[in-house]
Amino acid sequence: MVHATFRNQLGTLAGATSADPAGFLDGLSPIHDAWHREGSRTYGFLLFHTRVVRYFTQIVAPGVQPQIQPFTAADFQNMGVGPFEYDLENVDALAELADFSTAIESWHNTAHMGIGSATGTPMMDPRQNIFFRPFWRLHRYIDDLFVQAMAQYGERAHPNQFVTASATASHIEAAHHGWVPRI
């Protein structure tokens, strides 16, 4: 479980900063940067970021006003960011989750550039971007799609078994190690 290093760092950080939103963001900065700089990916794009978004939502988001909402199609259009077009309806196998992860990561990279240009935030710097609302709006949008895909995969692969989409993600991390770098 090579991905466990990042997963454990995130879990330890979340536990240590559960009542310290600024501490969470400060601690996330080097972890996020290290994940981006990793030569050979050990923890997939969607699995890493869904955990990051989950901890952000628990620790930081409750104190943020106004609340951080996911970007909408109109928001993307207004910033000159092309829409993410992918048919999630047929995502019901690990290979399809991996394909979805690859597709949305590619789109996300372009979105980071466009959002950075439109908003003036350092979206291309993983040490800094986590301190800015546009980063979280983008990743909330992506995570909403991933949660939908995970729920669908979980229901089709293991009908009526998982309690939450995050439980499905944790199952993949625990039982399908070979897929973790790709999802």
Model-derived features: positions:
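C-terminal accessory segments of proteins
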Residues: 1-183
